[in-house]
């Protein structure tokens, strides 16, 4: 992508309305634009990051055996009245009527709709277990939206829903998502700590929030510091192994970890003083097991091996991609801008032409740009005629992991400079070596 032809509206000044680092940097880098209170457009640079976040989420959901579908954002109020939750959500739920005066709502979540899909199609235990998920925009009329897309009214959510014949089967499905979430956050460059949580209006009796530590977090968290060093389930993880996944769950829930809502001061004080960690954190995922709450209310049942009908046991599992993007920035930035983990960076490399219009610089940059693009790399080529300082500031601000810098003096010697955005390390090398570094 040539920067001269790209839409990336950079802001030179810090926006006054931005309270936290991620909101400020997302606005300055031209990733998002506020349309109204708590509602944002995702501009091209931001959407590239969001798409890569979603790709990782989708990959790990599929690995864990979940199946993707797509449900509508507008839902019938009748389903929510049937489950008994229509009034529980209060003013957070946006309620409307269609031209036939039928009550509708803009879905804040999808337990009712997916249960309706299940009950109309699945009749036998032989079709279980089943886990359905989708990635969709949702709306909750937050009383105080703030922090950009960290806490917005319209947001994107990956929500998955599991169906099992028994509680034991449902716990295995829960453990699958538990392990999948640990892997997902790790691939996004985050260390997430699972903490027992309140089930809230979703309901049920088992729930975990996944929290990343950040000074700007809304939650106060208390946990054992060993969580920071725990190994993440690797690619060899067998998602069909009941014992293997139970061992992962037991390990990650064996030590004390809780947000302020579930905090037990006496239990925390039982942790050796040197092992206690008190901090602030950001919720990046939430999983629930709620048994037969919805299946009983909505008649979702299957015929069991005994020939009798059984209400299915359900769980739901949410990750907010539009919340994850600012969370990653909160965890990875410096005074100059964003430092993206390679897995979600909008571009892999930015090629900086220090003197656009100089034939040697132009030819060198075109050569590098073509070679890296052909090798399948996402490359941003800064071919603008901006000053060198502006080019460097832009590259640092948007956080692309590597910069290849081509100036007249270096190019005359057949060389370019490669900068690592994370470490700041710079290395001069031949043009061929620079290309081979990223395509070998």
Swiss-Prot record:
One of its GO terms (molecular function) is ATP binding. The gene is proS. It is found in: Cytoplasm. The lineage of its organism: Bacteria, Pseudomonadati, Pseudomonadota, Alphaproteobacteria, Hyphomicrobiales. Pfam families: HGTP_anticodon (PF03129), tRNA-synt_2b (PF00587). Homodimer. It catalyses: tRNA(Pro) + L-proline + ATP = L-prolyl-tRNA(Pro) + AMP + diphosphate. It comes from Rhizobium leguminosarum bv. trifolii (strain WSM2304). Belongs to the class-II aminoacyl-tRNA synthetase family. ProS type 2 subfamily. Its EC number is 6.1.1.15. GO terms for cellular component: cytosol. This is Proline--tRNA ligase.
